[in-house]
């Protein structure tokens, strides 16, 4: 007897500790103990976890939202700890409570966990335990509880009897007409997901009325969620019903009085096009789309413009060229002078994607003027985007033709006051080099690249050393010796130690694109000099450089060329220099 | 003017010079060494004498002569006579290439003339005394009493110390005048009238004017208006000034003191401690703000001294705004404690009432801890935080109700003809209020009283007096009055009284009505003339009642009847809604409820 009692006391111990910790003033302690919940459950065994731990958690559920959030998450993974599918329903009560709290994040997590454990229920226990809980949530007085209920229908519905199915349908319909917008919003967000688990034939009868209700809701935040639901319905219904029931709803949403809804339509444009496209009159769809492009609200125009190329690509091939040239480009021409910079930037990013779709002749006559106009835009971001789409032009007409007009724009961006703009054009250089050819590059762009090596922003200097490698790979080591190494020699002697360091960084990347002979002939002399620099920062960067450059050399040259230098640095008076030289030695195996 | 004609002169001179170029170049010029002087006319170069002077004395003599003065002559020194001749020929052109100067952005000329010292003194007197009537009269006659259009700054009312009107009013504690000044100088229409330009132009100027008013130190002790108000213990003024987010509370005066530092320095009343405390609260107090995201419904409490900025997280969600504020609290700790109890209290209510739950909880807590409470009422169409328990808050509501009623009146005039035709088709949703329908002597009596000429004349008046029985549209009430035959007559008449001016105890007519020629009350109570068309009963957000009305009523019902009686329309509203049971009111649905919208669509 006494042995048994003792065992009970021992077993009770974890709970006692947990209770203590959960009563602690300090939130972080409470959080920690909740995180250890599964360990405690494991120690208690399934039966006592069910009877005592879960009971305890259900009763003491009032805490800070952070603690509740972790609890909600943990309980979702508790199925094995309470004894598997036969007993999983004991988790419903604490999660039901958590699904009704005020804090959205906690509720959402509780719903997520409830969805997880719903799958673990047998069909029988789903009807016996889960459905009654869902009923309580869906008809509760608190809008928080009704909101949470919306997310649970789709996991229950496929696995219950027809009688309960019809009850669930009517419950959901009621939630779609709830007085609280938050509940209707949750219902609208889950409507599509719910429809997908319906028997195909039952969707119309079961849920279409809810969709029609929600898409005329007073709240635009509810209506905008029906865009996605309507698309989901569209994929589920057969052609005739889609045309009759879904098309009118989507058409209305295109013209919604709230710009947020129209923004959502623009965001989902391609999906809508896929749903409606094949059966709908193309001209009508194109008209609705061009209306979005001309929308009074900038955000809507932005979102619509973003999808210009994809929309055009999705058009039926036989009509595509005609539609692009006669409708889309006319609107695009207006967007070129849009008052909103973001719209122009988006346009610049997508417009040249139309080139392959309309062929060379039309590109020259229709797209090129737009291209040139955007190239001369006042906003750097617009110019940057349009230059970035150069490859697409190249495919159709060859970028070389454009070089004369491109150059001023590139030079302008290269000297832009915003370093992020400069950075973008730096990173774009290798592509430009390959599109425009070596001759043009050497003549016009190389000076810019060399200038960036002495930019006053580190990111620009760093990016320009990186592109040197790519350029050398493209044009060959010989090109680097004649064009870049002289600049290195100049930097090596610069009075500013930062420039001397840039020189080292550049040599690092160059060495990866050069042969051993070139390295020995061109690079090593410079490094040798910098090993004896007055500034320790330069010396230890020289050590780092030796480590990188050494990787491209044969062991014999390493011993003869690199080792003496590193040994010299190893005796340096500066700690950091000694450290990095040691590191380089080790990694090169010297 | 002078500059323009000078430029013209230069141009003319150039033309003149060009046409005579050959002649000029042939003319032998006296080549003498040393500096020479010429006298020239500022206004018209062509009038300038073509004489060269050898010394300053000589040229000065000419300039000061009667002839020189008549052309307002100036003189100029040149190194050689040729330079001097060139100057006379083309003005400054040869030395500094003279082009037409870039046209400076022309400042608009205010259509109003400047204000002179004497007028300003009169103005100062009114500001000091708080004489609102005369203050408004002067400002209306010339807005430049308030704004110096030259630099878009506050007009200086008192030279010497360079006080603007706020300095003076703050010192004198004229809270209302200050509120009015701040309102006027931020009013776009007022500024447009003043500058004679457009909205874009004055919006830019507005910022400068406001800043100049609030934050300009005076010339004596570098005191801002807030310093004055604080120093003299004018707590009302301090509140008005600190409410404006453009007020800089941190400015220091000559003695290195902030407005808070000099709180109550010159205040002599016995309640100095209280006053200092209040000033401290107004300047440095901490507030608890309730933020709401109208899209997701999520709420958040923050504690700070200044209202936080509104923000939007993505295009698909609406902007998060401050929807209520409690405070000021003396210390940050007090504010945090308040926020904590707000967070934990009333969990039930917060989860039942989605759009006012937090506010209802906070309101009660604020009352318990005697903190000031303000919240936004969206039906008013602004994000302003209002304390409906104060005169100012009720004033805003009253103005809203007045406007709403006026709008209803207009609408009912416009739609009168069409409603006449459709009234029968509208069925029970718009029954004509004919007391004959009700059986029972009392109502018949009332009906007779109202139309003493008999039922015939009542019929004649039909077209003018159309009432809509809104009760049929209040679900619960309508159900009762139509379906429940046991409903007592007393309760029925009471219910009707709630919505009609035939009420046995009619609320006092709002003052502006009695001034209106349309409504003649002069015949007195004994006259049985047909009363004017009652505007349809006003609910705040819609023609029919909704949850907002209930939310508003709950707040108004807590306010003392004495205070509310100063606002006739508000009082009227409270009396009408008070006739209904709390249960009836609680059945009013939110304005966007689908059930409610459906029934409205059917109508």
Curated annotation (Swiss-Prot), chain A:
Note the segments forming the HEAT repeats: 37-73, 74-111, 113-150, 151-188, 189-227, 228-266, 267-305, 306-344, 349-387, 388-426, 427-465, 466-504, 505-543, 544-582
Could you give a GO molecular-function term held by this entry?
Answer: DEAD/H-box RNA helicase binding
Keywords for this protein? Cytoplasm, Cytoskeleton, Repeat
Q: Which InterPro entries match?
A: ARM-like, ARM-type_fold, HEAT, HEAT_type_2, PP2A/SF3B1-like_HEAT, PP2A_Regulatory_Subunit_A
Q: What is its main location?
A: cytoplasm
Does this entry carry the keyword Cell inner membrane? no
Q: Which GO terms describe its cellular component?
A: centrosome; cytoplasm; cytosol; mitotic spindle; nuclear envelope; nucleus; P granule; protein phosphatase type 2A complex
Cell compartments where the protein resides: Cytoplasm, Cytoskeleton, Microtubule organizing center, Centrosome; Cytoplasm, Cytoskeleton, Spindle
Which Pfam families does the UniProt record give?
Answer: HEAT, PPP2R1A-like_HEAT
What processes in GO biological process is this protein linked to?
Answer: centriole assembly; embryo development ending in birth or egg hatching; meiotic sister chromatid cohesion, centromeric; mitotic spindle organization; negative regulation of insulin receptor signaling pathway; regulation of vulval development; spindle assembly
Q: What happens when the gene is disrupted?
A: RNAi-mediated knockdown causes severe embryonic lethality. Causes a failure to duplicate centrioles resulting in the formation of monopolar spindles at the 2-cell embryonic stage. sas-5 protein levels are reduced in embryos. The few surviving animals lack a vulva resulting from defects in vulva cell induction, vulva precursor cell (VPC) generation and in vulval execution linage. Partially suppresses multivulva formation in a let-60 n1046 mutant background.
What is said about its interaction partners and assembly?
Answer: Part of a complex consisting of a common heterodimeric core enzyme, composed of catalytic subunit let-92 and constant regulatory subunit paa-1, that associates with a variety of regulatory subunits which confer distinct properties to the holoenzyme. Interacts with rsa-1.
Family indicated by similarity: Belongs to the phosphatase 2A regulatory subunit A family.
Q: Record's PANTHER family?
A: PROTEIN PHOSPHATASE 2 (FORMERLY 2A), REGULATORY SUBUNIT A, BETA ISOFORM-RELATED, SERINE/THREONINE-PROTEIN PHOSPHATASE PP2A 65 KDA REGULATORY SUBUNIT
Task: Please state what the annotation says regarding this protein's domains.
Answer: Each HEAT repeat appears to consist of two alpha helices joined by a hydrophilic region, the intrarepeat loop. The repeat units may be arranged laterally to form a rod-like structure.
Its function, per the record, reads:
Acts as a scaffolding protein for phosphatase let-92 and its regulatory subunits. Probably together with let-92 and regulatory subunit sur-6, regulates centriole duplication, microtubule outgrowth and mitotic spindle stability during early embryonic cell division by preventing the degradation of sas-5 and kinase zyg-1. During vulva development, may play a role with phosphatase let-92 and regulatory subunit sur-6 in the induction of vulva cell precursors by positively regulating let-60/Ras-MAP kinase signaling, probably by promoting lin-45 activation.
Tell me what organism the protein belongs to.
Caenorhabditis elegans
State which gene encodes it.
paa-1
Swiss-Prot record, chain B:
Q: Can you tell which superkingdom this protein's organism belongs to? A: Eukaryota
Any one of the GO CC terms: endoplasmic reticulum
| Alphabetized SMART domains for the sequence | ANK (SM00248)
Where are the annotated segments for Disordered? 446-465, 505-538
Q: What topology does the record note for this protein and the membrane?
A: Single-pass membrane protein
Alphabetized Pfam families for the sequence? ANKLE2_3rd
Q: Where does the UniProt annotation locate this protein?
A: Nucleus membrane
Where are this protein's ANK repeats? 161-190, 221-250
Bias-annotated ranges (Acidic residues) = 456-465
* Record SUPFAM superfamilies: Ankyrin repeat (SSF48403)
Give one GO molecular function term: protein phosphatase 2A binding
Any transmembrane segments, and where? 2-22
User: Which family does the entry's similarity section mention?
Assistant: Belongs to the ANKLE2 family.
Summarize subunit and interaction data from the UniProt record for this chain: Interacts with baf-1. Interacts with protein phosphatase 2A (PP2A) components.
Tell me the function of this protein: Involved in mitotic nuclear envelope reassembly by promoting dephosphorylation of baf-1 during mitotic exit. Coordinates the control of baf-1 dephosphorylation by inhibiting VRK1 kinase and promoting dephosphorylation of baf-1 by protein phosphatase 2A (PP2A), thereby facilitating nuclear envelope assembly. It is unclear whether it acts as a real PP2A regulatory subunit or whether it is involved in recruitment of the PP2A complex.
- In Swiss-Prot or TrEMBL terms, this protein is called Ankyrin repeat and LEM domain-containing protein 2 homolog
- Give the species: Caenorhabditis elegans
